[in-house]
């Protein structure tokens, strides 16, 4: 609850900023405390029964990615109506309301861990050092989210330029296609509960690679781009849900620490994907962006091929 309110405070600072330094401060605070959303995932996994844990994780993660994608649509519409500050004013109010809802609805749980904070951080590294499957899944998450960022970072550049020349609001509507793909990935958690996580991962990574063909055709066809967005977001979310369902089985008493390590890797991939995408667009346009996406998708398949035998043991 406290972190949600602090994230809302960061948005208020950004909305009222009169200088670049003030905007950076507000954005940094929002980014720092918005990780509260990731705390809800291991909490939900802890409250769920073993037979439904994957399904529950899938539901929570679908909601998270849905928020990421629909935020683009809503932000575009709000920016058209009242400017960019309106986006942050509205978002801060919604976060404050969410804090109230969490305060009223979250159960009170006691932790069985008696480690201090430095020891907790050290134990995260220890988990990764001693568990090869955890490292494999974290790397898969890193690379899949890099694929996601490669597409979404440069897609706005493509749609704003000729021959499309779309407005901010119109570009934001493409988030609806991604949202549909994210919702379609929800059953992945159920498949993982049934011991089929290796199949969902293999199928998902192959589809991820194939999605870049439609995305490449998107430089001349909006329909092809929408199909590519649907498939890519479906596979990214499906693999992500499967990853989390698998790692939560490994150390049930350390789900928060597993989430901390896994999501750190995940967001590093997202940040790297954004940098790669912007650079590829600058130097080689949409073809360069698609080549970067294909390369990362192939790396994903290589990582999975090398770690596949470890997944069979978990199933």
What residue spans do the PLM features occupy?
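Helix-loop-helix hairpin linking two adjacent transmembrane segments in secondary transporters
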Residues: 22, 59-106
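Helix-breaking motifs and short loop linkers at transmembrane-helix boundaries and internal kinks
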Residues: 14-18, 218-219
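C-terminal transmembrane helical hairpin of 12-TM major facilitator-type secondary transporters
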Residues: 198-243
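Structural signature of the two symmetry-related core transmembrane helices
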Residues: 1-12, 199-213, 294
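Helix-to-loop junctions at the C-terminal end of transmembrane segments
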Residues: 183-197, 281
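Flexible cytoplasmic inter-helical loops of multi-pass small-molecule transporters
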Residues: 103-126
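Cytoplasmic helix-loop-helix junction between adjacent transmembrane helices
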Residues: 26-63
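Paired small-residue
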Residues: 10, 18-29, 223-231
């Amino acid at each position: 609850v406290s972190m949600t309110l602090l994230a809302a405070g960061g948005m208020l600072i950004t909305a009222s900023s009169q200088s670049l330094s003030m905007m950076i401060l507000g954005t940094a605070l929002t980014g720092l405390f918005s990780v509260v959303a990731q705390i809800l995932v291991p909490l939900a996994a802890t409250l769920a029964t073993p037979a439904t844990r994957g399904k529950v994780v899938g539901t929570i993660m679908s909601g998270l990615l849905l928020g990421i994608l629909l935020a683009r649509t809503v932000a575009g519409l709000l920016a058209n109506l009242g400017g960019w500050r309106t986006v942050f004013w509205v978002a801060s109010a919604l976060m404050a309301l969410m804090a109230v809802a969490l305060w009223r609805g979250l159960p009170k749980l006691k932790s069985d861990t008696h480690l201090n904070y430095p020891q907790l951080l050290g134990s995260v590294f220890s988990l990764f050092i001693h568990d090869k499957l955890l490292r494999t899944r974290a790397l898969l998450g890193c690379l899949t989210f890099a694929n996601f960022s490669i597409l979404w970072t440069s897609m706005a550049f493509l749609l704003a330029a000729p021959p499309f020349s779309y407005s901010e609001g119109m570009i934001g509507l493409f988030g609806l296609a991604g949202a549909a793909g994210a919702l379609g990935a929800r059953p992945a958690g159920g498949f993982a509960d049934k011991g089929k996580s290796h199949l969902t991962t293999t199928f998902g990574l192959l589809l991820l690679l194939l999605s870049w063909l439609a995305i490449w055709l998107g430089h001349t066809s909006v329909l092809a781009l929408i199909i590519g967005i649907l498939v890519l977001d479906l596979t990214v979310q499906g693999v992500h849900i499967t990853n989390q369902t698998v790692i939560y089985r490994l150390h049930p008493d350390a789900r928060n620490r597993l989430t901390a390590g896994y999501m750190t890797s995940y967001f590093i991939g997202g940040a790297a994907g954004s940098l790669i995408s912007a650079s590829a667009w600058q130097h080689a346009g949409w073809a360069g962006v698609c080549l970067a996406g294909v390369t990362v998708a192939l790396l994903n398949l290589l990582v999975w091929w090398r770690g596949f035998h470890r997944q069979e043991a978990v199933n």
